Design a protein with these regions (language model features):
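NAD(P)-binding Rossmann-fold cofactor-contacting core
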Residues: 196-210
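Short internal alpha-helix immediately C-terminal to a glycine-rich phosphate-binding loop
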Residues: 157-178, 184-196
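Short acidic/polar capping segments at secondary-structure boundaries
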Residues: 150-153, 182-185, 208-210
């Protein structure tokens, strides 16, 4: 994130981030514009943070949902039809909600959740297929710390993974990059990979549309 506006959460000695004498419950709200100002599109920084997060996961310093603490979220499915008036039904591609809670340790020491809502019919309404929000909570008290737009954050996090893979695994003199898909996530992948392999000379794309 940029130095002018550092919204990263840092824990000190893994203590609560809420002052005990402060009974107010307030939190930071970040719109998509705020997220851009905070540096969410800084692909190199995203790769570095993902490398740090994966190191914490390797150490077991994390918890995800589910009985084995590794579930990729809890999904809300809709039926194909319902006798109940106005009941939501699965009448489009990828209509679902997903709650994705987790705890991450280290200097972050924070709990959070990504709330994912998706409906293939959104395109006709001028909306993205999926709309995401992210909340961070104080892990000791449950107090909300931040509520933020999650679309750019999620795509950049996803793109940072192949960026990190290229950093650690790709041959040092790689000159050609091939991407399957030309959507938002592929753009984020391209941004991240180019930050760690700036000497790439040829980029090949394959999309589903002519």
């Amino acid at each position: 994130m940029n130095e002018d506006r550092n919204v990263e959460f840092e824990a000190t000695d893994r203590k609560s981030n809420v002052e005990p004498e402060n009974s107010e419950v307030s939190f930071l709200y970040l719109s998509e514009e705020n997220m851009v100002d905070a540096g969410v599109l800084n692909a190199a920084r995203c790769v570095d943070v993902m490398e740090e997060a994966l190191g914490l996961m390797e150490d077991g310093d994390f918890i995800m949902g589910g009985p084995y603490n590794d579930a990729h979220g809890l999904m809300l499915y809709f039926p194909k039809k319902s006798p109940i008036e106005n009941f939501p039904v699965n009448n489009s591609r990828d209509r679902r909600f997903i709650a994705m809670p987790a705890y991450l340790g280290g200097r972050f020491h924070v709990a959070g959740e990504k709330w994912y809502g998706s409906n293939g019919n959104n395109r006709a309404k001028g909306l993205p297929r999926s709309i995401l929000m992210v909340m961070l909570n104080d892990v000791e008290t449950g107090k909300p710390l931040a509520y933020m737009s999650g679309n750019l954050l999620s795509s950049m996090r996803t793109g940072a993974m192949p960026g990190l893979a290229a950093k650690l695994l790709a041959v040092k003199d790689a000159k050609v990059l091939s991407l399957l898909g030309c959507g938002v996530v592929s753009k984020a992948c391209l941004m991240s990979i180019m930050t760690v392999r700036p000497d790439i000379e040829v980029i090949k794309l394959k999309g589903s549309s002519p």
